C-alpha cells in the first residue's frame, strides 16, 4: 500500500506561523534610502495595512497584496485552498472586491511527486473560484520545502477603503471567526488531536472573509484587518498604533474553537505564539498563560477584526447574521494611554 504523504512533515513552519516576527520584520523594513513618494499610493507599508492601495483618480482604487506560506495541513488540496483563501482575505480586509489571483509555488521536485503540487494548485484554484475570480497565472521555483500562496489584485471605491489608521475612539471591536487555529493545528501535528476535533481548524481556515466587502459599505466601520500570524493582540496593536489609540480586550468574550483550552494544557502551543509575545508583550497588560496562548496564537486565514462606531453596530450585526457569520464582540477602542500599554486585557 502506498504511504500517505503528510505535507507538514516537509516544512519547518506552518501557515501564518511561518511569518517573521514583528520585531525582526521591523529591522528588515527599516531603510536609510530616501522614500519614493507617489501621491496616488494612498495605502503603503507605513501603517502595517493588509494590502497596498493605488488611487486611479476616477473614484476607483486598485488593491494589491501577496501572501504565501508552508503547509499547515497534510492534505495537498486543503493546503492550496487554505493558502489561497488566506491571500484573498487581504483584499476583503481592506473592504475591496478581488478580481484576479496569481499563484506563487515553491516545490521540492526531487522529494515529492508533481501530482502533489498539482493538487495544491487545484486547491488554490478552487478557492479562487469560490471568491469569483480566476487563477490567472503564476510562477514556480524548485525549493527545499513546499510553499504556496497568491498575489491578488482587487478593486474598491476609493472613499470606502478601510485603513488601520482610520479607527476611532469609542468603536466596538468585533471578530468574525473564533481563535485557536494555531493551537489545533499544533495538536494535530503532535498527534494529540481528538477525532471529534478533526477538520475544525480546516473548516475555519477555508471560510472566506468576503463579508469584508459588505462591511466596507458601512460608514461606521472605521477600520478592518484580518487576524493572521501575529495573533489577535498583534493585529489589534497595528490598528491602535496606526490610529494613535489604545484598546481594551474582554477576555471572557473571546470565542475559541472546541478543545482549544484542553490542548493548551497539553502544551500544544505553536512556536509563533512565543515569538509574537516577545515582539509586543511589553505593549499589553498582564496576561495569564492561557490568555497569552489564545490572544497571541498565530492564526492562518483567521477572521476579520472590525472596528465599529456605536451607531452602526446593529447594521454590522445584521449584515453578519444575513451572511451566516457568528460575529462576536472582543473589546473596544479608547483614547491613547499615557503609559506604554497599548492593549489592556480584562
Swiss-Prot record:
Disulfide bonds: none annotated. ATP binds at residues 19, 47-49, 67, 90, 138-140. GO terms for biological process: selenocysteine biosynthetic process. GO terms for molecular function: ATP binding; magnesium ion binding; selenide, water dikinase activity. One of its GO terms (cellular component) is cytoplasm. InterPro entries: PurM-like_C_dom, PurM-like_C_sf, PurM-like_N, PurM-like_N_sf, SelD_I, SPS/SelD. HAMAP family: SelD (MF_00625). Synthesizes selenophosphate from selenide and ATP. This is Selenide, water dikinase. It comes from Haemophilus influenzae (strain ATCC 51907 / DSM 11121 / KW20 / Rd). The lineage of its organism: Bacteria, Pseudomonadati, Pseudomonadota, Gammaproteobacteria, Pasteurellales.
Amino acid at each position: 500500500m502506498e504511504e500517505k504523504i503528510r505535507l507538514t512533515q516537509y516544512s519547518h513552519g506552518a501557515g501564518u506561523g511561518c511569518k517573521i516576527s514583528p520585531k525582526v520584520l521591523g529591522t528588515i523594513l527599516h531603510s536609510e534610502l530616501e522614500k519614493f513618494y507617489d501621491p496616488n499610493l494612498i495605502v503603503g507599508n507605513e501603517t502595517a495595512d493588509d494590502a497596498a492601495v493605488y488611487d486611479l483618480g476616477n473614484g476607483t482604487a486598485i488593491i494589491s497584496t501577496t501572501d504565501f506560506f508552508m503547509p499547515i495541513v497534510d492534505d495537498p488540496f486543503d493546503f492550496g485552498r487554505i493558502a489561497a483563501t488566506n491571500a484573498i482575505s487581504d483584499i476583503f480586509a481592506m473592504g475591496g472586491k478581488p478580481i484576479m489571483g496569481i499563484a506563487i509555488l515553491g516545490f521540492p521536485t526531487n522529494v515529492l511527486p508533481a501530482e502533489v503540487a498539482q493538487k495544491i494548485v487545484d486547491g488554490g484554484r478552487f478557492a479562487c473560484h469560490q471568491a469569483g475570480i480566476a487563477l490567472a497565472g503564476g510562477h514556480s521555483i524548485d525549493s527545499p520545502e513546499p510553499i504556496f500562496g497568491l498575489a491578488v489584485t482587487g478593486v474598491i471605491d476609493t472613499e470606502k477603503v478601510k485603513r488601520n489608521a482610520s479607527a476611532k475612539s469609542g468603536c466596538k471591536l468585533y471578530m468574525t471567526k473564533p481563535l485557536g487555529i494555531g493551537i489545533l493545528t499544533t495538536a494535530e501535528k503532535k498527534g494529540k488531536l481528538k477525532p471529534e476535533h478533526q477538520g475544525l481548524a480546516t473548516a475555519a481556515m477555508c471560510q472566506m472573509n468576503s463579508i469584508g466587502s459588505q462591511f466596507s459599505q458601512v460608514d461606521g466601520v472605521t477600520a478592518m484587518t484580518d487576524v493572521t500570524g501575529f495573533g489577535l493582540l498583534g493585529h489589534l496593536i497595528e490598528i491602535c498604533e496606526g490610529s494613535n489609540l489604545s484598546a481594551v480586550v474582554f477576555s471572557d468574550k473571546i470565542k475559541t474553537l472546541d478543545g482549544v483550552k484542553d490542548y493548551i494544557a497539553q502544551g500544544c502551543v505553536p512556536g509563533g505564539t512565543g515569538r509574537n509575545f516577545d515582539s509586543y508583550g511589553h505593549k499589553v497588560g498582564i496576561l495569564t498563560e492561557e490568555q497569552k496562548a489564545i490572544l497571541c496564537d498565530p492564526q492562518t486565514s483567521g477572521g476579520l477584526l472590525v472596528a465599529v462606531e456605536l451607531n452602526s453596530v446593529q447594521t454590522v450585526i445584521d449584515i453578519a447574521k444575513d451572511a451566516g457569520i457568528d460575529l462576536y464582540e472582543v473589546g473596544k477602542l479608547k483614547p491613547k494611554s499615557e503609559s506604554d500599554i497599548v492593549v489592556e486585557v480584562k
